[in-house]
From Swiss-Prot:
Enzyme nomenclature, EC number: 6.1.1.17
GO CC annotations on file: cytosol
Quaternary organization: Monomer.
NCBIfam families: gltX_bact (TIGR00464)
Name used for this protein in its record: Glutamate--tRNA ligase
Cofactor binding remark: Binds 1 zinc ion per subunit.
Binding site for ATP: K239
GO biological process: glutamyl-tRNA aminoacylation
Organism this protein belongs to: Shewanella sp. (strain MR-4)
Length: 469
């Protein structure tokens, strides 16, 4: 049997990291077993579902690279199918119409609560004969009486629920709209889902869904209920712990590879290995290796992974993601070095692409002023001669190469009988406006000869004015 999994988010908000991890685990289960992955949008909550949220989910999945083989399917486009099955169940007697009023249901729950009993429907309409009436009704599933529902969860082992603890679930509301638990069952059946990976908050839904599947004569999929993600303080992950939207991590400068690597390790492991490519994940992933204990989100580890991928991935690929941040920070890259070359130069220093973009501005744009602190420290009177001499040597170069630039700077220090720092630091401030950059030779090479000479002239003028003031 072909493995077939699904990710089925509700479009009531963005794709958060918990949902992204569930999607990743489900995607990996399919890919590790040469199976298929389905994307399904569970939008039956019509009042809360929005197109914007749906678009955000698709954007997040695409950014992460979690491609789907089928879908996206939308539950709101399948109402005819759900109603067809409900009609069959009413005909077969596995479902019934319940005419109990809201007042009666509320009174029943209050009485059960007062008596310390579990709150559940009492089956008042379960065996009533059919009525020819215009009274409003819901449709309930006729849950089995007695016995239990047992399933082996890939993460939590054997789980058992007594049928007596389950009430007759509403599968269609008074307005005729089918309910979540029912739609899920029909979808999983129709789509041939063989393994359901989802959060632990769905465990209580599982016995209800299994009973409906049995009533329909449908196969029962395997289940894996993954634990929640906590903040570093042990509380449920929320906005106060930082970004929770997948696309917010994009905006903050993280690569999808870093986030995927981090998310897969939030509950799953393979020995002591920390860094996993997507291909390695597909080869090694097993649902049975997921830990059932909650995982704590640690931003420092994510930053470390992001640095690793910025440094080790193909610079052209990193540049393709960096371009978004250059555009976001309004840095025009059309007049300057190849962005991949800038990635190579700055990768060792950057924690995020957002930082990398900000620190690369001087490669593409002239700056209005020097950093005040660095200028005070390095653009002093003693810097005038080194700047003038290095400008002459750089201007004389017939080939603008990293090696030639390095030799020109070195020759300046040798001729003036000073350390490289006496030449290098004023020169760095002159061409970048700041006190930090990659090696001066590669920095000047990427800035370009004309622009470098112009900036050195500006620094010489700045120092001369300072001497004369």
């Amino acid at each position: 049997m072909t493995t077939k999994t699904r990710f089925a988010p509700s479009p009531t908000g963005f794709l958060h990291v918990g949902g992204a991890r569930t999607a990743l685990y489900s995607w990996l289960q399919a890919r590790a077993n040469n199976g298929e992955f389905v994307l399904r949008i569970e939008d039956t909550d019509i009042e809360r579902s929005t197109q914007a949220a749906c678009d955000a989910i698709l954007e997040g999945m695409n950014w992460l690279g979690l491609t789907w083989d089928e879908g996206p399917y939308y539950q709101t486009k399948r109402f005819d199918r759900y109603n067809e099955i409900i009609a069959q169940m009413l005909e077969q007697g596995t479902a019934y119409k319940c005419y109990c009023s809201r007042e009666r249901i509320d009174a029943l729950r209050e009485a059960q609560a007062a008596n310390g009993e579990a709150q559940k429907y009492d089956g008042c309409c379960r065996d009533l004969p059919a009525r020819d009436t215009d009274e409003p009704f819901v449709v309930r599933f006729k849950n089995p009486i007695g016995g239990s529902v047992v399933f082996d969860d890939h993460v939590r082992g054997r789980i058992e629920f007594s049928n007596d603890a389950l009430d007759d679930l509403i599968i269609a509301r008074t307005d005729g709209v089918p309910t979540y638990n029912f739609c899920v069952v029909v979808d999983d059946w129709d789509m041939g889902i063989t393994c359901v990976v989802r959060g632990e908050d769905h465990i209580n839904n599982t016995p209800r869904q299994i009973n409906i599947l049995k009533a329909l004569g449908a196969p029962i999929p395997e289940y894996a209920h993954v634990s929640m993600i906590l903040g570093d303080d042990g509380a449920k992950l929320s906005k106060r712990h930082g970004a929770v939207s997948v696309m917010q991590y994009r905006d903050d400068g993280y690569l999808p590879e870093a986030l995927l690597n981090y998310l897969v390790r939030l509950g799953w492991s393979h020995g002591d290995q920390e860094v996993f490519s997507l291909e390695e994940m597909k080869q090694l992933f097993k649902l049975d290796d997921i830990n059932k204990a909650p995982s704590a989100f640690n931003t420092e580890k994510l930053v470390w992974l992001n640095q690793h991928y910025i440094k080790t991935l193909d610079p052209e690929y990193v540049a393709s993601h960096l371009q978004w941040h250059m555009d976001d920070q309004k840095i025009d890259t059309s007049n300057g070095p190849a962005l991949s070359a800038v990635v190579t130069a700055l990768a060792e220093r950057a924690k995020t692409l957002k930082e990398l973009a900000a620190s690369s501005r001087y490669f593409y744009e002239d700056f209005a002023e020097f950093d005040a602190e660095q200028a005070k420290k390095h653009l002093r009177g003693v810097a005038l001669e080194p700047l003038q001499l290095v400008q002459q040597k750089l201007a004389a170069l017939t080939e603008w190469t990293v090696e030639a630039i390095h030799q020109a700077i070195e020759a300046t220090a040798t001729e003036l009988e000073v350390g490289m720092g006496k030449v290098g630091m004023p020169l760095r401030v002159a061409v970048t406006g700041a006190g930090q950059s990659p090696g001066l030779d590669i920095t000047l090479f990427l800035i370009g000869k004309v622009r470098s000479e112009q900036r050195i002239s500006k620094a010489i003028e700045f120092v001369a004015d300072r001497i004369n003031s």
